[in-house]
Amino acid sequence: MSILVIGADHLGDIAVNLKNLGCHSLTHLKGRKNINKRKLKIPEGTDLVLVMTDYVDHNIARCIRSTAKNLSVPVIFSKRSWTYLSQKLNMVEKLS
């Protein structure tokens, strides 16, 4: 699974936990105002977009949701907490 993470200055153990769940490719963009939303692209082959809501600009969140929808890539909006994120990931797996 290839995951694009947007937001959070540092992922900490979240990156390790995602790799343990089978993520072979992890791309991280910090998500604050330093991202140009016109140039924001989802890498080819991305299976999931994860947006850390505590650390992301609202305009970036809207832009990434729209882009992901056009590419039929699922998006998860989550706090930067592994407990909260794992619950969201479980909900997505049950829907699949």
Features from the language model and the residues they span:
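Redox- and metal-dependent alpha/beta enzyme cores, enriched for Fe-S-associated oxidoreductases
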Residues: 1-23, 37-38
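A generic structural signal for well-ordered alpha-helical segments
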Residues: 18-19, 64, 68
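Short glycine-rich, flexible loops that bind phosphorylated cofactors or substrates
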Residues: 57-60
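Short acidic/histidine-rich motifs immediately flanking catalytic phosphotransfer sites
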Residues: 43-50
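Short amphipathic alpha-helix with an adjacent loop that forms part of the alpha/beta core around
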Residues: 38-43, 89-93
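A short, well-structured beta->alpha microelement
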Residues: 24-41
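Glycine-rich, N-terminal phosphate-binding loop of Rossmann-like dinucleotide-binding domains
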Residues: 53-54
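Ser/Thr/Gly-rich flexible loops in soluble cytosolic domains mediating phosphotransfer, phosphorylation
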Residues: 68-96
